């Protein structure tokens, strides 16, 4: 019916106990293409940024099925991390996109509908940290406030490995 959603590259939710505290870990890898999943005309779909729209649907589904199932999640330890394949509005001083660009849909959803905090942005406001060779930040770590208060530092590590593999 067109309303169904599939998380093409996968997502997972694990609960682990550390020091007597339960931590919810959500990992993900969203759709990487400019065109929508199963688009018949990939070029046209890409021009319409339908890949961004599809990723936003994946993100809503992931959040609805994980943190969205727990009424008091904002007071618990939650972390969501992975390859979001999407840029964030907080980095738009680097990208220079129009404010209504669909590229922001994924992170706009997270910031507007969940208690998650982008920890790299929070710890390094205004200090852009790319996560890809092409100069974009598409890999993110989000946390709820209680878990974030335990963080001492966070940054993108550039150790040479990414130069040998593809973004």
What is each PLM-predicted segment?
Residues 17, 24, 50-85:
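His/acidic metal-ligating clusters that form di-metal
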Residues 22-48, 81:
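Active-site-proximal beta-strand elements of phosphoester/diester hydrolases
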Residues 46-54, 97-101:
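Alpha-helix N-cap and loop-to-helix initiation/capping positions
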Residues 68-79, 86-167:
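Metal-dependent phosphoester-hydrolase catalytic domains
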Residues 1-33:
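Structured beta-strand-rich core segments of catalytic domains in phosphoester-bond hydrolases
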Residues 10, 42-43, 155-160:
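Short intrinsically disordered coil segments
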């Amino acid at each position: 019916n067109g309303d169904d959603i599939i998380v093409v590259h996968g997502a997972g939710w694990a609960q682990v106990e550390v020091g007597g505290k339960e931590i919810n870990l959500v990992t993900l890898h969203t759709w990487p293409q400019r065109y929508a999943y199963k688009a018949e005309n990939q070029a046209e779909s890409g021009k319409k940024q339908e890949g961004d729209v599809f990723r936003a649907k994946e993100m809503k589904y992931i959040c609805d099925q994980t943190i969205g199932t727990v009424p008091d999640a904002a007071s618990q330890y939650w972390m969501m991390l992975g390859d979001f394949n999407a840029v964030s509005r907080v980095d738009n001083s680097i990208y220079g996109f129009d404010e209504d660009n669909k590229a922001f849909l994924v992170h706009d959803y997270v910031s507007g509908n969940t208690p998650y905090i982008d920890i790299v942005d929070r710890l390094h406001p205004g200090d852009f940290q790319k996560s890809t060779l092409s100069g974009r930040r598409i890999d993110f770590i989000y946390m709820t406030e209680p878990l974030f208060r335990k963080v001492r530092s966070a940054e993108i590590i550039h150790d040479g490995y990414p130069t040998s593999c593809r973004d």
